[in-house]
């Protein structure tokens, strides 16, 4: 450890600063290492260059605690009585800990996760939090991940992961399925500043994420601070978009009591321009079609939420015990049906959600080596759909009228998407995830994991006949998953293995009113599902810089809530006959690096995969005359492909991350039940992008204008190759496909010397290209955003 000191002016004598750099022995910066000053309860994390800074510290002597992932941490005494200091701390590139020379040896958390053998990508949101980016945009730059959105901010979002999408890819927040949080608290609404990192597991999920998933999962790890802190940000941009985030917390360094509060607000008109084959007006007198360039006129979106945690950490009887509360709500206008030909002018939905949670975590509980963590949540969600006006609208925002000047209706006494409705769904979700681990030996660990989820939905609509309302029963869905895991390591941790076995059980029960002649009768549906699955993940460090990763799983996913029970606000019809999806998943990949040549640093990651799927659950086709859609099983699908990612760093100034993904998912069932060959046998999956690439370039200027200030300029390029909207064999030439899309984004960020204030500007889709997704739904064109971030305490 070295100390580089400099003096302050007399005016600043009572306040000092502590700066430093944490690097690995090979020269690579140590990112996200914790640096904590105990006496004043302040902490920070190192940036991507390994640098940290504390400003305006009262003169005195301090104890600085430095902790890297999966180490006990080290303590350094610093004297700031007379002058400021600069620390240089060097970390080795392995997991052992050496305190004698104030040198710790560790790996980043991301690398530790990857070296367990799973195919996983880690997206660090913290270093991009000062930019005006959505969390979905950051995740979408990950190799093998394609974000599917049906519009602008707040629109329906799902994820395509190595060719599998929708609910085949499970999404978690801190290991709990995201559906328990309500749709108003999702990756689309949570700002990056509230997220520490996003873990993307491709194909094979570890046992501790006890869920049924066919194509992998995305685990959003929310930021957790152990100090007193306060930060706020505000951004404004195109389409009248406002976004606010405030994050504050207090920690008592004596009792270890802490409280954290985070809040967010998103608001936008989403009035961007759309044009093309699906944007037109019809002359009521001649019936002629005129294609127009129009603004979306009924697509406002607003969401807000508050998240509070209160509890203790690092006390005798608990490593962590926390009570949490999340309250959020969302309002959004609905501009279109499932396709852009269907234009709405009055339909809207509202959602509110409240979630109470309890978390407990303790190592060496009862006996040494036994660890327990448990998380329980109770959530209540209200979902309301308002659709009572039957008028047809054109893309010019005007009511369509007939020859007599009277409004044209979708249907008499109906709404825009069918029967008039004020439907209200009241949903209750109870969930518990518990993990019990026992370290049998330094090389062997066993685990037992349990997940319980009880979902109920009560449906009511005051506009429906009373007899029908009386017969509409509560929907029940109960899911239980038990998994067992065994982890081991051999040859001084060069070989690591992870074996697991999972048991799935799901029960569904409901009663629906149906017409039987002139009467309305109740039809009861009940179905129980029981299955099992198993898998393994293995990693082997061939050399310190070459690691082989392989994983395989017999995976299963049971039909989800919206797929089975429908969702009125998203135009989804129930499909009670869906079968579970099953798949045999296999991954083979390599981690190469870090390779260092003078000031140049390289990392390469690659993964090859196979997915052999039966009964894939996918969205059915929605025609222009249909306002709703359901889900269906596809007999057999086989997907193969690969991901490749390259990271380059020059002198901790120039950073380049480039990735390429290609998969080949084909319909693999040749004959139907009558022996006839499917016309789309061996076709690519419809509405599925299969070739994507992304490149992010950033250059940083340190000490820009003033000492300790930072300026960064960044550019992002995104490429999506054309893909068919429907089956290739059914598509007409020149139509029914989503064209090749290229996106160019620019950004610039400036951080003041005290590290408290940052200002960023982002320009997205600067060439104003048409961008389509989700069955040819057009996304925003060129847009500009400005964001101010202020951190008075950090």
Predicted feature locations:
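Short, acidic, small-residue-rich periplasmic hinge/interaction motif at the N-terminus
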Residues: 25, 34-36, 67-71, 81-129
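Short acidic/polar hinge/loop motifs at secondary-structure boundaries
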Residues: 55, 176-203
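A beta-strand signature from Gram-negative outer-membrane beta-barrel systems
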Residues: 89, 192-231
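Extracytoplasmic beta-strand/coil segments of soluble accessory domains associated
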Residues: 136-177
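Face-selective signature of the C-terminal outer-membrane beta-barrel domain
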Residues: 309-329, 351-518, 523-525, 529-545, ...
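Gram-negative outer-membrane beta-barrel transporters
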Residues: 504, 603, 607-612, 630-726
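Membrane-embedded beta-barrel scaffold of Gram-negative outer-membrane proteins
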Residues: 549-553, 580-640, 661, 667
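C-terminal beta-signal and adjacent terminal beta-strands/loops
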Residues: 556, 614-615, 713-743, 748-794
